[in-house]
Amino acid sequence: MILLSQAYELKLAPHPAPFSVLKYRGFDDVSRLYRYEVEFTSPVAGIPMDQVLGRPAKFIIDPVDPNLDYLRKMFGENAEKFSDKPPARTIHGIITQFDEYGTSADETRYKVVLEPKLADLDRGVTSRLFQKQSVEEIVTGTLRHYGYQSGVDFQFQLRAKYRRYEYITQYHESTFAFIQRICAQEGIWFRFEQKRDRAVIIFGDDLDAYARNQRTVPLRRDAGLESAGAEAIRSLERQTLRVPEAVRLHDYNHRQADVSLLVEESAARDDKTTHAVDYHWGEHYETPEEGRRIARLRHEAHLARQITYSGKGNAFSLEAGEVMRLDQNPADAPHGLFITSVESGGGRSEAYWNTFTAIPADRVWRPSVDLAKRPVIDGILPARITSPGDYKYAYLTEQGWYVIKLPFDLDEWSPGGTSRPVRLARPYGGDNYGHHFPFIDGTEVAIIHTHGDPDRPVIMGAMHDSLHPDLVNNLNNTRNIIRTAGGTEWRVEDKQGVEHSHLTTPYQTSELNLGHMVDADRRERGQGAELRTDGHLSARAAKGMLISAEAQPGGSGEQLAMPNADATLQQAEAILRSLNDSASAAQAWLAEVDQQRALVEQKLAKLQKPVIVASAPEGIGVASGQHMQLAAARQMFVTAGEGLDIGVLKRITIAAGDAISVFAAKVGIRILAAKGKVQIQAQGDAMELMSLKDMVVSSSDGEVVITARKGVTLGDGAGAYLKIANGKIEIASPSEVQVKGGLDVDGPAKGNFTFPGWSGSPLKDAKGNMNFGFSE
């Protein structure tokens, strides 16, 4: 076919003025926007910008058949049916640039740039979030958002199945650059097909998405023999590169921290021309299977550039993304060439021409992924914690992650769905232990990103702002405070002279205060230590507890040091042992000194057993507004170095299951009753009243009655006695009997006496504690 000349036409809707195309140059690449620079002249000068810029346009290249005049003579109106010229090519788009060069008397020279409508998505940068979508779904949703119709304005011809990403971020990049980037990362490329009324975007990922126009172009290297206008490839050059033999990837997925993500893949294992392993960290995949898929895509991208061709010619209507067959296909491309880029040109004084780059058509084209060109978020980005419905407490996942609202995200999301769950970096952590103060809705947080990747945010910490002021400022700059949203607080004051630690919770106002104590207005309310609550308080120590008022200056000394208590307990043991010796001599019942010694030496000393030792050098006071109970399951010891005073306003009861022994070694025993009877009874045995010296039995306002059912005997140390028994009186004396005073002897008479009686049943053994009870 002979193509000596072409007709060029530029059409706008509406058309502002007559145009005559002077020349053009076009650029078309796979996965890029095509660009046609068209220069033209017009008899109209000063065409307004708004009549051209941004308007839909068509650039038409229509070959001229040099034999058309002859065919018209032969066939008339049917001449074009017998012409060999290919159909005209129409490039659709919009005008993105409009220049005016100069004006002469006859015409004005202009230049426009025609690009696809998709170029409008490359004008300004924006930032958006996409969640739980595949790349195909993201691209489809984005293009539809801007008015593109699926199946009409764009089509997907994909073979692979693509996973849904939890989170993909468009950050400070144009929408076109974002689409271009995420497609490249998945190994998806795109091309344009010029239809009758529009340019259609075709997304593909394999050989079957290549455009196949079923034509064969002659390869005619310039030899001066062929006709100068014949459609052909005039030159074809091959370039080969030594590429990596494999791609190795590695990453880390904190959701499966024990799973290794180190993978390596090769798409050409038997190729001896390859060498080295291309290793990258941080492609952001979650499983080894996904990693191997990405590694294979990256190696296929290397292999797609292993063999490349560059050519020149005038093959008409050559497009990036199509397969071109040659009548002499190269040995490395037996199935033809896949065109990756085309540059073309022509005009009034220049025949149509083009240059191209290509790869063998049996190789899968993969866009190159330049990691350095990915958007990067450097430094700290502010964000806010979000939750569904202003959740009162921290809204967390099972793993303890948060949902955040990023400042650049202008989309409306369902409550609590503004981001994927984001991890919180903490100063300390481990297997179910660590440091975590939960954030609630509205908290400002500082966000950083792993490797600067916008898809991998991490919460670094919380920030205060005008809505959430800091709890430490110039007014309390000596205080260190940890306070929760619920009001639980730990405050440490560093101001010299009033240092303190204050731990409190609002519930029942439970507090621990150490050091200098102040109220809410910083007025002093005490010093030392205080543990208080409006509720219950318990103190437990499984190995023993020491409660002591003994001084340890400067906090020095052993934890269980209690020298004063030890001395007092040892003194008590010595006192009781000494009193026992005296009691033994007096034939009184003895105290259980051995048990006391065992208690002191084997249990109380150094808290060898679970005991409580309470010690105070100057005294201990125990007070109760109502009742008090002291109980011991076995033995109770009460010892004092000087005296024991027990005062009860109403009454005292002392009861013993076995016996009571009261012994006074020196001064004596007094039992007095200011009012009421004094009763002493031996209800089950004899009673002995003995004294070393005089014994007085008297009644100041009554009589003394001495009775005994079996008799009464009064005797002295010399042998004289008076015996009353069995209804008779017997008087005896080893010497004389003196009777002073009158003596009346009458007939017999009888007295009537009442004798007490007691139950003969024995007392039951008391099971449990023996108590001293003190009551009102």
Region annotations inferred by a language model:
Residues 1-776:
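Amphipathic alpha-helical and helix-coil boundary elements used as assembly
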